[in-house]
């Protein structure tokens, strides 16, 4: 069963450089995700990680919004709709059920983020608010509200399925 990020990969393609995401940034993002999850579980903010600014930004977001997470790095799939995904966070922000996706890019790709969060909302199958959380290297963050766009996600599904036919 394909993942949401596999289905939406077309939105992340860099037409200028002819590739997807840079491996360095992908690895950095993975590390930040792991350390933010550790912080959620332990309440301890690690230091000396090489990504301390991103972690400070996440801690500041948590201080400012006081989210109540029901799920952290939540793996979900649905055979009936034919895809799966790992949702960074699901829980309550400002009293509303939300899906939050963490981004570490200096300029998040909003089309890709919209497609990704829409896929996650479809999987969760509950009324939710969608957010991207941009964590910045210097310790700032930006909470980005996203409107679900099912036409965009379905277009990604069509491209994905066409790519499977050879």
Where are the regions a protein language model picked out?
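Nucleic-acid nuclease catalytic cores
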Residues: 74-166
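Metal-dependent nuclease catalytic cores that hydrolyze phosphodiester bonds in DNA/RNA
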Residues: 1-84
């Amino acid at each position: 069963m394909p993942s949401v990020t596999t289905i939406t990969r077309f939105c992340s393609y860099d037409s200028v450089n002819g590739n997807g995401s840079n491996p360095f940034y992908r690895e950095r993002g993975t590390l930040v995700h792991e350390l933010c999850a550790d912080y959620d579980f332990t309440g301890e903010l690690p230091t000396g990680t090489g990504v301390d600014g991103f972690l400070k930004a996440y801690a500041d977001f948590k201080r400012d919004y006081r989210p109540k997470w029901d799920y952290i790095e939540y793996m979900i799939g649905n055979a009936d709709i034919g895809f799966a995904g790992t949702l960074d966070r699901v829980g309550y922000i400002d009293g509303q059920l939300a899906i939050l996706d963490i981004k570490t890019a200096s300029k998040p790709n909003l089309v890709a983020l919209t497609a990704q969060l829409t896929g996650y909302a479809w999987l969760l199958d509950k009324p939710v608010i969608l957010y991207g959380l941009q964590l910045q290297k210097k310790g700032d963050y930006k909470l980005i509200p996203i409107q679900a766009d099912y036409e965009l996600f379905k277009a990604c599904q069509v491209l994905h399925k066409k790519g499977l036919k050879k």
